[in-house]
Design a protein with these regions (language model features):
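Outer membrane beta-barrel strand-and-loop segments of large Gram-negative receptors
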Residues: 224, 327-339, 378-380, 465-471, ...
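Surface-exposed extracellular loop regions of Gram-negative outer-membrane beta-barrel proteins
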Residues: 110, 253, 260-267, 310-312, ...
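Gram-negative outer-membrane beta-barrel transporters
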Residues: 385-392, 495-500, 517-605
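N-terminal periplasmic accessory domains that precede
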Residues: 61-64, 81-84, 96, 111-114, ...
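Extracytoplasmic beta-strand/coil segments of soluble accessory domains associated
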Residues: 62-104
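Short acidic/polar hinge/loop motifs at secondary-structure boundaries
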Residues: 101-130
């Protein structure tokens, strides 16, 4: 906290001799069920633009958000990273694309990627805490919504063609993309394509920590950290006085190495040779979205949606003792629903209904879970009202979840009903500040993995055992925040407490599997429950002012969360505290961004299988410049650097943090052309 105090003092001193510029953009938050924009929302939320995403090169979704207050990442290599919000991850965080849940198998294994392409997006919306219930598919911990304009809700005015090229030094990575949008005789058309190829990424000396008793030649790169991606998406829509209607199709194919699948015995390597674990994914997603303006006595408007996803991931052994063995993970899902606008006068009211069917299967050599059939039905009511100096938001949702599968040859048909609600108050203290209180009670049904996992999971070197008798998690939340923007400084201070009954987590038993499964002698880990509490805070201050011929912006922030069980022990792999500093300068067609993230050491470990993690500093730099060329709307060159200090860095939240550190220093260049 001393660093924050010092920085505030520095900002205060600067403010005595500069001219401030307060011009923060207002953005529509598409995932807001109540249809709010950023000036109307006081919930803990981040909005990240496409420009901000492109400043630092291509990363996984988790790593792209890792420098945001209250948001971290758990990773399994360069392109495999899942977001962590206020210490919660996995099924407690929902990843959405245009408001619809992303239906892949990233929840089954830490080595599985989130199947979302960040090419040609408009923005990413991150909602933290219980207020996420007021947004599309709100979850116990928060949501991440990736927004693009594949299905345009407004007529496109002009044709736009974009080209992009990127190169990264840390893995000799090359990225190419081309995007087109146009209106052809009243039909809005969107096309986007990306191809990426990354070799093994470089790591600092002595970055890999091997298991006790295992030695290996140190290398300057991480084996099997390569990846290839090909993604395209297309959509069409029509917009009329009555509303809009659109369809879209998306395909993503990945081929990537798994950088850790357990340490191999030297005698086995001598006999069978080196082994490579390679995964390939193929997904097709078809969406329908639309809106119809009824203007009736009860219903004003209906927004509707339908989504069909066909996803597969094949994990194959190439070389070594298990050469040719494969495991196929599949997920087929359908989801549909509607949002009914029944607002009256100054009272915003919405009713949301959803239905989802999902079939998840694992076939092959490492089929550690039986096929699971899931059905989910939900209905929710949402209200927003302005009462004097108060703004009130309320949401309540009823969920019914059914899962069918087998566990130890016993068939299970599990029904789980839950009710969640959130109540938010915003009091306007004066023209530049407000105080917000959010109270929430949210429930979460156990996931398929938590219920039915039962087998060897080599990626995490565990024999994982689920429990069909797990109860629903019940979370009670208090979130208090103060926001201000007085044309000199702006900032937010958040304090929160999250009491979770029946918190589900995986714990090592200290025993090993000796039943002859492959791989052999894996540590046994059970999914169990215990009451838990997460307490934390998020502080961020900023200012921007005229400087030289442009505008200079400074922000400082800190986030911290502690997670403990009712018996006083620690929740495993909890996010360490962080200090985040950013400096940005813009002048006409020039932009410069410097980001420094100081990640504190984490010594509050959570029992067997968890270990302390050293702190580190990540320094990132980005410089962008646009040039005027004849016949070109914009030609922009971006120079960027990641981990400029070449620090040994590892995410404490990762199950393979020792064997799979973060990449070393990366220097990159990108070109963006808009016609």
């Amino acid at each position: 906290m001393k660093k924050i105090t010092y920085m505030i003092a520095i900002l205060s001193a600067i403010s005595t001799s500069i001219v401030f510029a307060n011009d923060r953009e207002e953005v529509l938050v598409t995932s807001s069920i109540l249809g709010l924009n950023t000036s109307q929302i006081e919930n803990p939320i981040h909005i990240i633009s496409e420009e901000d995403i492109n400043k630092s090169g291509t990363h996984s979704l988790g790593e792209s958000l890792d420098n945001l207050i209250g948001v971290a990442s758990t990773d399994f290599g360069l392109l495999i990273g899942q977001p962590v919000i206020r210490g919660l991850s996995g099924p407690r965080i929902k990843v959405l694309e245009n408001g619809l849940v992303n239906r892949d198998v990233s929840g089954i294994g830490a080595d599985h990627p989130i199947d979302i392409d960040l090419n040609n997006i408009q923005q990413i919306e991150v909602v933290r805490g219980p207020s996420s219930l007021l947004y599309s598919n709100g979850a116990l911990g928060g949501i991440v919504n990736v927004v693009d304009n594949t299905i345009s809700k407004e007529d496109l005015a002009d044709r736009e063609v974009k080209f992009g090229i990127e190169h990264n030094s840390v893995n000799d990575g090359k990225v190419h993309n081309i995007n087109l949008s146009d209106n052809l005789q009243g039909i809005n058309l969107s096309l986007a394509y990306k191809h990426a190829n990354f070799n093994n990424f470089e790591i600092p000396d002595e970055a890999v920590i091997h298991e006790p008793g295992h030695t290996e030649e140190e290398k300057d790169h991480l084996e099997n950290s390569d990846a290839k991606t090909a993604a395209y998406k297309t959509g069409v829509s029509i917009v009329e006085d009555w509303g809009y209607f659109g369809v879209s199709f998306k395909n993503i194919e990945n081929v990537f190495g798994i950088p850790f699948h357990g340490e191999h015995d030297e005698n086995e390597i001598a006999q069978y040779g080196e082994e490579r674990i390679e995964s390939s994914t193929d997904s097709d997603t078809f969406n329908i979205k639309g809106s119809y303006d009824i203007s009736g006595n009860f219903i004003n408007k209906v927004d509707y949606f339908y989504s069909d996803t066909d996803y597969s991931l094949i994990e194959a052994h190439i070389g070594g003792k298990h050469n040719g063995e494969k495991t196929t993970f599949s997920n087929d899902a359908e989801e549909f629903g509607a949002i009914l606008d029944i607002s009256r006068n100054d009272l915003t009211q919405k009713i949301v209904v959803r239905s989802m069917d999902e079939d998840t299967s694992i076939l092959g050599e490492e089929a550690f879970m039986e096929n699971v059939q899931s059905e989910e039905e939900s209905i929710g009511y949402y209200l927003g009202a302005k009462i004097s100096d108060f703004h009130l938001d309320f949401g309540i949702r009823r969920d019914e979840v059914n899962r069918k599968s087998k566990f130890n040859n016993t068939a299970y048909d599990i029904d789980t009903d839950s009710t969640s609600f959130v109540l938010g108050f915003c009091y306007e203290l004066n023209s530049f500040s407000d105080l917000n209180l959010t109270l929430g009670s949210l429930e979460r049904a156990p996931s398929s993995v938590e219920l039915f996992m039962n087998g060897a999971h080599a990626a995490v070197q565990r024999f994982e055992v689920g429990n069909p008798n797990l109860k629903s998690e019940e979370s009670r939340n208090i979130d208090l925040s103060y926001n201000f923007d007085n044309e000199v400084f702006y900032g937010t201070i958040n304090f929160y407490q999250n009491d979770v009954d029946n918190y589900i987590y995986r714990v090592d038993t200290g025993q090993t599997d000796t039943a002859g499964s492959e791989p052999s002698n894996l540590k046994i880990a059970n999914f169990v429950q215990k009451d838990a509490e997460l307490d934390g805070y998020e502080i961020q201050f900023g200012t921007d002012f005229d400087f030289l011929n442009g505008n200079l912006g400074l922000t400082i922030g800190r986030d911290s969360v502690e997670g403990t069980f009712i018996d006083g022990s620690n929740i495993p792999r909890m996010v360490p505290a962080r200090d985040i500093y950013t400096l940005s300068y813009t002048e006409d067609n020039l932009s410069v961004d410097i980001d420094l993230t100081e990640v504190n050491a984490q010594s509050d470990i959570g029992g067997v299988g968890d270990s302390a993690t050293a702190g580190f500093e990540l320094l990132d730099l980005s410089v962008g410049r646009s040039f005027a060329l004849e016949g070109v709307e914009d030609f922009r060159v971006i120079l960027f650097a990641n981990n400029l200090l070449d620090e040994i860095a590892r995410n404490h939240t990762s199950t393979v943090k020792n064997e799979v550190p973060l990449p070393g220093k990366n220097l990159g260049i990108g070109f963006r052309v808009t016609l």
